[in-house]
Amino acid sequence: MDTYAVIGNPVAHSKSPFIHARFAQQTGRIIHYTALLAPLDRFEQTVLDFRKTGGKGMNITVPFKFEAFTLASRLTDRASAARAVNTFRFEETGEILGDNTDGVGLIRDIEVNLNFPLAGKRILLMGAGGAASGVILPLLQQQPDLLAIANRTPDKAVSLQRQFASYSNITTGHYHDFAGQHFDLIINATSASLHNELPPVPADLFRNAFAYDMLYSSRLTPFLELARVQGAGYLADGAGMLVEQAAESFLLWHGIRPETQTVIRQLRDNLRHPTS
């Protein structure tokens, strides 16, 4: 039986095993998929140990996407552009292929599942870590009017801007630099919701905007609750993105892209009723 895992710290909350079990059932594959907690200082060793036991591939989550980029011996074009990796495929040659499916997962969820075209929109992306890195190029490829990147440490946002210097419609700054500005879409790519915290968002930033949290929960995340209070026009968490990016990983491993709408509904039901 082929074995796969999601690796992170923390990772016990991950719904990736639930999702991939549904994909396997849907496509007639027999796999074992588990969640693997890696010590913060032993990511590489944990990955290599998993491969030695016969592991075929991995998904990578917080906080290891940059380390995964470094560990990969070969990269897809989208992982190379992002300089962050969220999927490994272990090749028979011994190589580790690194991919990044975050961006395509986000775009499919927002544009297809939620029917929100990004062309011509003003977008604010909060965060400059691995999650943000993976979605910048796919967002830019949708031709928004503006992509602003806000981060507590502006230098990190500037570094991302330089990665995509061929695009002139990127701006960066601290959160407070965007006070009083209007955005059509505000995306939380920080891990703050994992810790029941909030990025330092200016007052009234969300008014009439579409607020999207890349994390997911059975209830409104702190980010989405703030957006609701501030008058956001629409709220969405990252459950759909999680399923869509997982489908891309499944395609990389098995050569078939599973249907996602049913699994998104199943995930929503599971979040509300965890024993289902």
Swiss-Prot record:
Catalytic activities: shikimate + NADP(+) = 3-dehydroshikimate + NADPH + H(+)
Enzyme Commission (EC) number: 1.1.1.25
Enzyme class, UniProt record, top EC level: oxidoreductase
Biological source species: Nitrosomonas europaea (strain ATCC 19718 / CIP 103999 / KCTC 2705 / NBRC 14298)
Entry-linked InterPro entries: Aminoacid_DH-like_N_sf, NAD(P)-bd_dom_sf, SDH_C, Shikimate_DH, Shikimate_DH-bd_N, Shikimate_DH_fam, Shikm_DH/Glu-tRNA_Rdtase
Source organism, top-level taxon: Bacteria
Job of this protein: Involved in the biosynthesis of the chorismate, which leads to the biosynthesis of aromatic amino acids. Catalyzes the reversible NADPH linked reduction of 3-dehydroshikimate (DHSA) to yield shikimate (SA).
PANTHER family per record: BIFUNCTIONAL 3-DEHYDROQUINATE DEHYDRATASE_SHIKIMATE DEHYDROGENASE, CHLOROPLASTIC (PTHR21089:SF1), SHIKIMATE DEHYDROGENASE (PTHR21089)
Assembly and oligomerization: Homodimer.
Pfam families tied to this protein: SDH_C (PF18317), Shikimate_DH (PF01488), Shikimate_dh_N (PF08501)
Protein name: Shikimate dehydrogenase (NADP(+))
Active-site residues (renumbered): 65 (proton acceptor)
GO CC annotations, alphabetized: cytosol
Family to which the UniProt record says this protein belongs: Belongs to the shikimate dehydrogenase family.
